């Protein structure tokens, strides 16, 4: 199981929170103290919280559950897309559209339209259109790809959300709460932990820190999937041995 150590977290500055004047009092249990008017996060809480969440995600991947990676702010967007794609999980990294979970039927229609446009682009339909019409469809495709591209293969609601910066993604969390979908969240000292089932107190702004968390969750997914594949291989071998 891929685990993250306190040293790993210290190296990327996970312990640095926000300026003390911007703190959320609900994060008090996770704060070690303050240095130069910056809150310091108690990594004694972060390490077990993060590793327990990684174990949960690994087990979910073993059971072929879907983990939706969510991080739309600049510090997280690129990493969310890369690591979710690497682990074969859905993601939202541009902008959370209201109703992405609670109005999934409408979202499904948009995904269908995205697929239609992708087919038209690849089969030469765009080439037969007027320049203006082709340009309009290309723009529509780009817009849909930006907002829906990461969830087009999700095939239904996710089983868990992994969120970087819970305040920034509050709409996503509220939708998940409404549907009873558990939420794993990286929660900084200025954030409200309400609605987050698995709170990971940590810096959510430093790019290297975000890369560490998101990469670890992608690794956990891959390890869970590999464990499932390994079990399937063993089953085949046992069956063959029995038949022999």
Curated annotation (Swiss-Prot):
InterPro entries associated with the record: Ribosomal_uS2 (IPR001865), Ribosomal_uS2_bac/mit/plastid (IPR005706), Ribosomal_uS2_CS (IPR018130), Ribosomal_uS2_flav_dom_sf (IPR023591)
Keyword Ribonucleoprotein carried by entry: yes
An example Gene Ontology biological process: translation
Gene Ontology MF terms in the entry: structural constituent of ribosome
Keyword Ribonucleoprotein: yes
Gene3D superfamilies: Glucose-6-phosphate isomerase like protein, domain 1, Helix hairpin bin
Pfam families to which the protein is assigned, alphabetical: Ribosomal_S2
GO cellular component: cytosolic small ribosomal subunit
Domain of life the protein comes from: Bacteria
Keywords, ordered alphabetically: Ribonucleoprotein, Ribosomal protein
PANTHER family xrefs: 30S RIBOSOMAL PROTEIN S2 PROKARYOTIC AND ORGANELLAR, SMALL RIBOSOMAL SUBUNIT PROTEIN US2M
Family: Belongs to the universal ribosomal protein uS2 family.
NCBIfam families per record: rpsB_bact
Identification of the protein by name: Small ribosomal subunit protein uS2
Organism from which the protein derives: Marinomonas sp. (strain MWYL1)
């Amino acid at each position: 199981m891929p685990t993250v150590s306190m040293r790993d977290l210290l190296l990327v500055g996970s312990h640095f929170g926000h300026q003390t004047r911007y703190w959320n009092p609900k994060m008090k249990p996770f704060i070690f103290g303050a240095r130069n008017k910056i809150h310091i996060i108690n990594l004694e809480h972060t390490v077990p919280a993060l590793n327990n969440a990684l174990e949960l995600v690994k087990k979910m991947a073993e059971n072929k559950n879907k983990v939706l990676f969510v991080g739309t702010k600049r510090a997280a967007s690129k990493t969310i897309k890369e690591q979710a794609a690497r682990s074969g999980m859905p993601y939202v990294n541009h902008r959370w559209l209201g109703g992405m979970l609670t109005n999934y039927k409408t979202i499904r229609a948009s995904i269908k339209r995205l697929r239609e446009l992708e087919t038209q682009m690849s089969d030469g339909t765009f080439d037969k259109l007027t320049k203006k019409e082709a340009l309009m469809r290309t723009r529509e495709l780009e817009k849909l790809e930006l907002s829906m591209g990461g969830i087009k293969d999700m095939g239904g609601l996710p089983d868990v959300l992994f969120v970087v910066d819970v305040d920034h993604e509050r709409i996503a969390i509220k939708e998940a709460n409404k549907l009873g979908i558990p939420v794993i969240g990286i929660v900084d000292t200025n954030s409200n932990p309400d609605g987050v089932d698995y709170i990971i107190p940590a810096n959510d702004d430093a790019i290297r820190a975000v890369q560490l968390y998101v990469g670890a969750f992608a690794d956990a997914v891959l390890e869970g999937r590999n464990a499932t594949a390994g079990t399937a291989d063993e089953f085949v071998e046992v069956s063959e041995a029995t038949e022999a």
